[in-house]
Amino acid sequence: MLGATVGSLATLGSAMATERAAARSQFVQWRRQHRRDAYANYLGAVYDRDVTLDAVRDALRADRPDLRDVDEKMERFVARARDVHRAAELVILEGPSSVVEALYAVVRAAADLAEVVRRMVRDAHADDTSRKAEDTALAAEREHLLYQAVKGLRTAAADVLGDSGIRH
């Protein structure tokens, strides 16, 4: 009788351990999927914002830019930037800190680029071309730094998710 009781308790303990392991595995998968979705949404929003900023820069390339067109494109850029901020909040919540640090590098690089483009827009409105060549080169340099920061974020996200295939 004692042997049967011990055997039953051992079986019950084993079943409980298996159930806990399954629940933990399910939680880990759920968390991974939420992080993947948050990271993908953020990167998609960053891409959309960058496309609208490229459109602003393209509109500013003309010797005499159409200011109405430039302003409309800037409005679209501002709307996309808001989308990026909303998506960033979820990444910050999902973490971990390595991804959040990489996200902040993207935020800083994007802000640096946007600052140059905003100055270019102000100069276009003032019909001031004295810094146009310098700012165009600076914007290209900052765009490259932003690209590097986004690459760093993708790498950090891949490390967290265990997806080495999305590093490049």
Where are these regions (language model features)?
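Feature marks short, highly hydrophobic, charge-poor N-terminal signal-anchor/signal peptide-like helices
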Residues: 1-4
